[in-house]
Each structure stands twice: as C-alpha cells, then as structure tokens.
Amino acid sequence: GHQKRRWNPKMKPFIFGARGDIYILDLKQSLMGMDQAYTFVSNVAKNGGSVLFVGTKKQAQEAVADAANRCGMPYVNSRWLGGMLTNFVTIRSRVTRMEELEAMEADGRMALLPKKEQILLRKELSKLQLNLNGIRNMKRVPDAIFVIDTNREEIAIREAHRLNIPVVGTLDTNCDPDDVEYGIPANDDAIRSVKLLADFIADAVVAGTGAPVSAEEMAAPAEAEAAPAAEAAAPAAE
C-alpha cells in the first residue's frame, strides 16, 4: 500500500485497513483478483493467444523479463515507445532494422565500415536492443497485456484499450481499478511482490499452453501463493 494521502478513492473496496499512515490491501481481494487473472490468462494461452508483459520500473524490469522468457511471451521492460501497439507496423520496421544491424555485426560487415560509422551503428543497435529485444518475436499485436504498476504504464494501457486489448494489471492503493479488465490488488513497489505476480502470470500461460486446466487446478496456484502474498501486500518503503 501507499500513504493515505496518495490513495485513489476507487480502491476503497480493496483496502483492509490502515497501519499508521499506510493503507493495507485486503488479501481476500488480492486472491480473488489473482484467480480471475489466472483463469483469463490461461485461457488466452490455451487458445493460442499471446500476452505482452509490461513493467518498466526498476523493481519490475528483471522479474518481467525472466517471467516472460520462461513462458515464451514478449515483454517490454525498458521504455514503452509510443505506438508500440497502435503503430505496430512502424515498430516492426524498427525490429527489422535491429535484426539487420545484428546480422552486419555477426558476419563482419560492420567491421569493414569506417570507425565513425561503426560507432554510430553500434550506438543505434544498442538503443534498439534495449527497447525492442523483448518484442523481437512478437509478429502481431498481443491478445492481452499484463502490466506492473498501472499508473506508470498508462500509455501502454491507453493503447491497449484503443485496440480493445484486455489488460491484466496490479492495483496498488494509488491506482484506478477502472484502468484494467482484470485487476490484482497488490504492492507494485516491493521486488518480492512484483516477482511473485510476474511468475504467477507466467504460470498461467504455461498452464494454458499445456494440458487443459480444470477450475480446481486454476485455483491451486493462487491458493499456494496466498502466504507470500500477505507479505507482498505489506507497505513498501516510500
């Protein structure tokens, strides 16, 4: 949770109480949100859909990349480039450019160029890899996006909604639950909480791409995470 002065009143139904000046999220609501998100994401994956993982804040970058790579899904963890969804054709052209530069580097053509040009091209390549490496294999817009910190990733959410792409997102006490179709009330600042949730969504993808998942199996992972979630929802250091 966050300090009381930073809360969003729309989050009131998801708040258990307060500890000093910090609001504490209701873990029953967190568990319910996790169950709903798990069911949705696993069904998207089961039907051959893709889920784009998005988390550009420092606490989320590693967890988002690791979770997405584990379940074979694309991710954005450095910077959301405007138009990543709404101007996808242009973004794909930048990915193609990145792959062309990588090929030049790999086969030695870049080394044959003048030093100044090599420096410029390597700088361009480094920037492209930083921003686009996680979506190099994303050939079309995703069927859903999973977002850590809906306030920070508001541009990504806005683009998703313009294209009617459902959003799964973490909801801390300062967030707007109306921004997402599937909200998970949770601490979005603590690294342990972020990793837990990113891994949880990756598990849902893996379950969906594997054997059919029963309702009981869908609920099991969320129940197993209930204890760590209690710590995850505790107040993060400001």
Locate each region found by the language model.
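Short glycine/threonine-rich loop/turn motifs
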Residues: 156-215
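Intrinsically disordered, compositionally biased charged tails
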Residues: 207-238
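Short amphipathic alpha-helical/adjacent loop interface patches that line ligand
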Residues: 38, 125, 198
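Long, charge-patterned amphipathic alpha-helical coiled-coil/hairpin "stalk" segments used as oligomerization
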Residues: 71-178, 182
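Short His-Asn-centered micro-motif
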Residues: 54-57, 147-149
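Residue-level signature of catalytic and energy-coupling elements of molecular machines
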Residues: 53, 145, 197
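N-terminal cationic and glycine-rich segments that engage phosphates or anionic surfaces
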Residues: 1-39, 45-50, 57, 61-104, ...
